[in-house]
Amino acid sequence: MTALKVGSESWWQSKHGPEWQRLNDEMFEVTFWWRDPQGSEEYSTIKRVWIYITGVTDHHQNSQPQSMQRIAGTDVWQWTTQLNANWRGSYCFIPTERDDIFSAPSPDRLELREGWRKLLPQAIADPLNPQSWKGGRGHAVSALEMPQAPLQPGWDCPQAPEITAKEIIWKSERLKNSRRVWIFTTGDVTAEERPLAVLLDGEFWAQSMPVWPVLTSLTHRQQLPPAVYVLIDAIDTTHRAHELPCNADFWLAVQQELLPLVKAIAPFSDRADRTVVAGQSFGGLSALYAGLHWPERFGCVLSQSGSYWWPHRGGQQEGVLLEKLKAGEVSAEGLRIVLEAGIREPMIMRANQALYTQLHPIKESIFWRQVDGGHDALCWRGGLMQGLIDLWQPLFHDRS
């Protein structure tokens, strides 16, 4: 068979996203490709194509930013790295005509954050990869799952566009704002017995990565009980940063205003042991805050990549929730908790490990998971479903 000429039309037609070769039982060599729409360097004004892989080249790594390399005389840009066989994560490309974003040879953490902040609005998904969505920071990303990546319950089901949720507008007197809320019910059971799950960053799970077909599939498979799901929009990054980190007003408004509104539409159980609060990053912090302060209402906490460093972003001091637990101001006694963090988000992993150590006396009711991934919704989506399965497993015994 004749080898295809690099950069030819037939060569590009043979590419369907990243390619990998096994190096050994644990590692693969992975190559990413991008086609310059302007052609070769003779015609193109593109100076750099930054590659932003969550948990590998992102700002959480505090490492030198990586640019793809052009193959001279072609429209081909490529970049190669090594990844674990069980790795899963999202990535994007950032083509730019500028060559001065990361001018320092070894930029520090603040320079990295600022540089990526400038670049990410220009990010694009991999045109060769059919799996893409809008990431949490608003830019397009694509998915990469290595051959031995852990199974993600329910995400193997076909997308079913006919499955939709009821969308309402919640006008909060306490918070002085309005937002969208999605209400979704599954299964067939006495309405008052249905468990309740509150999902933070609801707009992401409703629109960017819709959970409806996944929840429906897992309920049909009897891995999840029939339930009511409430997805709360964060409004925007400013409201999110104010309302989610340890904000009593937000959770009082949820309990006093939103939940009665939801209950009139889709009745659910008031039992704390049937109620899950789930969130990621600031949302993970917020979920545990709700459980610690209102355990009589929120008995199950699903925290993924929780920002337990808050409010000390540098990570040099303990976060406020850990301080309160150590001082005995709050107690996790009686809660069931899923605590998950990625080994490729160092500061968040350290904060979660410290929290888990503090919670260790009640370890029988804690599910602690370390994921080979970063600060990444592609990882969170599997942990979200597995967490619901684990937290609600006792309900199946109640019914038997």
Where do the language-model regions lie?
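Aromatic-rich carbohydrate-binding modules that target alpha-glucans
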Residues: 2, 23-25, 29-86, 96-153
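Short beta-strand segments enriched for Tyr within beta-sheet-rich domains
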Residues: 87-95, 183, 194, 250, ...
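The feature captures the conserved acid-bearing segment of alpha/beta-hydrolase catalytic domains
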Residues: 309-379
